[in-house]
Amino acid sequence: MSAPRTLYDKIWDDHLVDSQDDGTCLLYIDRHLVHEVTSPQAFEGLRMAGRKVRAPEKTLAVVDHNVPTSPDRHLGIKNEESRIQVEALARNAADFGVEYYSENDKRQGIVHIVGPEQGFTLPGMTIVCGDSHTSTHGAFGALAHGIGTSEVEHVLATQTLIQKKAKNMLVRVDGQLPPGVTAKDIILAIIGEIGTAGGTGHVIEFAGEAIRSLSMEGRMTVCNMTIEGGARAGLIAPDETTFEYIKDKPRAPKGEAWDRAVEYWKTLHTDEGAHYDRVVVLDAANLPPIVSWGSSPEDVVSVQGVVPNPDDIQDETKRTSKWRALDYMGLKPGTKITDIAIDRVFIGSCTNGRIEDLRAVAEVVEGRKVAPTVSAMIVPGSGLVKEQAEAEGLDKIFKEAGFDWREPGCSMCLAMNDDRLKPGERCASTSNRNFEGRQGFKGRTHLLSPAMAAAAAVAGHFVDIREWK
């Protein structure tokens, strides 16, 4: 009888082509997602070597990072570098026979939202993209992670990837989530617990009652930020929630193929007695709504808490780093989180740009107005999310409240397009990174859930969504 295996072990074993004595392995790749920023050099490398894309039907190209989200984006991209990258992807996709969603295609959006909603992402697959937040797709029980540009070329040419196997880590969130606490709070709490290096060298499997209770949108939020916890990838075993989400998606299996697929997918779970190299357990009942205060995703605290004092940290290097973060953020120790006023609100990104996120925002802001001191924007994660939101009348709620309703794209998650913070502006953001300059030069980013961001937009400062009336 074979030894019990984790979910990660099973997917790895199913895709192992070859292994060397030093641990170097060759993995088969089922799906390759491509966007405009990390692919130009890879395609050019193929062109110069006279190679073709080995499996164009397993490759999908989408523009997302550089595209404008303003209503007039059909007039073209003003920034020359951004325009060149977008035009290059369109040309490369055509030259190499890869399916491509342009900014004028309603299926276009952030690549990690597009893949799942098209059924391109399926359980048990290996999925790569030249983007760190490829871990999002792990919500489906797929082994998904980011790769570099040279690796993008390697996968395009061979449909394989050279890797070394990571360690197994389990993060179990027991119990039921309290009202007002979301998937975003779960993953921020996990990163706060283990730190941004806590998952280094590991693939994390998320489990427990609180994880099982999440929708697929919530599970994608959790897996999306696995990389912020230092791990290579995040995984959640597929179940009926997964199957229901995938069923009838454009690229999902149909008929007998569907039945066979589900039969296989049901085997994708960790065996009883399988070994994890590290186990972390959290109690969902103790989780509050969370807000980040510093310039790292591990710098988090309860919305009812205060900005911590770095002098309480024993490690000198870390203490110095946290003082630098406070200086950058313009905050002082002991300041109540609910006393921090904001200038901007960004709701969107591959972390929280899905229809469930927008519904949560609408529930908070309906019949209310954005504070006069705040500029707020909502960017749907894809054209299909935008279409669904408008069919439900959410756009009207947003506009009446004073939000700017945009076109799909990565937008203000990162300062690679027209949507960015001005120096000194403080933003409540549903994105995944609060690094210095991430949303714009000297911009100050606070990470939080969509409902919390929406409430902050109305109040003009952070508020506890549990007390929202």
Swiss-Prot record:
Catalyzed reaction equations: (2R,3S)-3-isopropylmalate = (2S)-2-isopropylmalate
NCBIfam families from the UniProt entry: leuC, PRK05478.1, PRK12466.1
InterPro entries listed in its UniProt record: 3-IsopropMal_deHydase_lsu, Acnase/IPM_dHydase_lsu_aba_1/3, Acoase/IPM_deHydtase_lsu_aba, Aconitase_4Fe-4S_BS, Aconitase_4Fe-4S_dom, IPM_dehydratase_rel_enz, IPMI_cat
EC number, UniProt record: 4.2.1.33
Binding residues annotated for [4Fe-4S] cluster, in chain numbering: 350, 410, 413
Gene3D superfamilies xrefs: Aconitase, domain 3
Pathway: Amino-acid biosynthesis; L-leucine biosynthesis; L-leucine from 3-methyl-2-oxobutanoate: step 2/4
Species of the source: Rhizobium meliloti (strain 1021)
GO MF terms, alphabetically ordered: 3-isopropylmalate dehydratase activity; 4 iron, 4 sulfur cluster binding; metal ion binding
CC cofactor note: Binds 1 [4Fe-4S] cluster per subunit.
Functional description taken from the UniProt entry: Catalyzes the isomerization between 2-isopropylmalate and 3-isopropylmalate, via the formation of 2-isopropylmaleate.
Protein name in UniProt: 3-isopropylmalate dehydratase large subunit
Signal peptide: none
Entry cofactors: [4Fe-4S] cluster
Keywords recorded for this protein, A-Z: 4Fe-4S, Amino-acid biosynthesis, Branched-chain amino acid biosynthesis, Iron, Iron-sulfur, Leucine biosynthesis, Lyase, Metal-binding
Record's keyword annotation contains Membrane: no
